[in-house]
Amino acid sequence: MRVYSPGRVNLIGEHTDYSYGYVLPMAIDRYTVIEGEPHERVELYSEHFKKSVSFELEKLEKGNNWADYVKGVYWVLQREGYEVGGMKGRVGGNLPLGSGLSSSASFELAVLAFLNEAYSLKLSRLDMALLAKKAENEFVGVPCGILDQFAIAFGREGKAIFLDTETLDYEYLPFPEDLEVLVFYTGVKRELASSAYAERKKAIEEALRVLGKSSSKYVTEEELSKLPEKERRYLGYVVRENSRVLAFRDALKEGDVEAMGQLMVEAHRDIAENYRVSCEELDFFVEKALELGALGARLTGAGFGGSAIALVEHGKGESLGREVAELYTKVFPWTPEVFVVRPSEGVMVL
């Protein structure tokens, strides 16, 4: 059996999902691939790490390595009462790890889809997204929202996804065929479980508690004045970002490419200045991409390194990416990865 599980880019709506706001991601045509068969225990070889891991299903102890994502999936399935056996196989693919393209969620969904097929668990795509999030939150220990798992489970070729992360209502939006998304991986690995991510999440939760709101969607600009300075700055960014997601959705429906690009640029400047999760490398890419003709550009994912994206006219992404990469390597010691992506199908078993 072979499973393809895509990565994702978030076109707009960053750091809004853990306060139940709006997001607008798409699954991409870069994949985690698992090739294997059912087995009595777990035996997996990682082509990326060039290492094997094996464990019994009764012994799901964290090891602080890539196997934790597999163990987390088993742990949550067992807790939810599913009868599931082991797996034996290889993990590979062309999705860069630690790049801000949701390689961890992609891996978890790949494991879930494999087990769903192998053991006839009858899980829906929503079931798989929610189980993967629970594994990440409660076993791996990363306090992420639902964005990544949902995008990877529900991806559709040629479509972006508008998602309300509170209600989980979603809408497929056709992505313009005359545009493409350039991904620029800075080479700066970022640990999502870092204290900075957790600190922002905690500040947002505290701000919502003070205001008596269940979601950032319900907070107005006027209400922000009731908050201390740090919480006001952080939640202010999230409130504005929710508005930008709605505006981006409208622009996408109307084919207003200029508005889409402008909203991406505003989003990046706001997140860099007020949420403070950007870095020199991400800012450099955004600035240079815009100078070289990108319609819009911004960081994607949690920030603190990882990847940025640019919205470009179809056929121009690769050359623009190469130009920025050439400038980038003269300034920074990292080797970037540059590639063009299109909206892709969600996790699939072949």
From Swiss-Prot:
Binding-site positions, substrate: 14-17, 197
Gene Ontology molecular function: ATP binding; galactokinase activity; magnesium ion binding
Protein's UniProt keywords contain Kinase: yes
Cellular component, GO annotation: cytosol
Transmembrane feature ranges: none
E.C. numbers: 2.7.1.6
Signal peptide interval: none
Location(s) in or outside the cell: Cytoplasm
GO terms for biological process, alphabetical: galactose metabolic process
Catalytic machinery residues: 148
Reaction equation(s) it catalyzes: alpha-D-galactose + ATP = alpha-D-galactose 1-phosphate + ADP + H(+)
Keywords for this protein: ATP-binding, Carbohydrate metabolism, Cytoplasm, Galactose metabolism, Kinase, Magnesium, Metal-binding, Nucleotide-binding, Transferase
Gene3D superfamilies per UniProt: 3.30.230.10, GHMP kinase, C-terminal domain (3.30.70.890)
InterPro entries associated with the record: Galactokinase, Galactokinase_bac, Galactokinase_CS, GalKase_N, GHMP_kinase_C_dom, GHMP_kinase_C_sf, GHMP_kinase_N_dom, GHMP_knse_ATP-bd_CS
Pfam families cross-referenced by the UniProt entry: GalKase_gal_bdg, GHMP_kinases_C, GHMP_kinases_N
Binding site for Mg(2+): 104, 136
Pathway(s) annotated for this protein in UniProt: Carbohydrate metabolism; galactose metabolism
UniProt binding sites for ATP: 46, 98-104
Site (Transition state stabilizer): 8
HAMAP family: Galactokinase (MF_00246)
Family: Belongs to the GHMP kinase family. GalK subfamily.
Chain's role: Catalyzes the transfer of the gamma-phosphate of ATP to D-galactose to form alpha-D-galactose-1-phosphate (Gal-1-P).
Name used for this protein in its record: Galactokinase
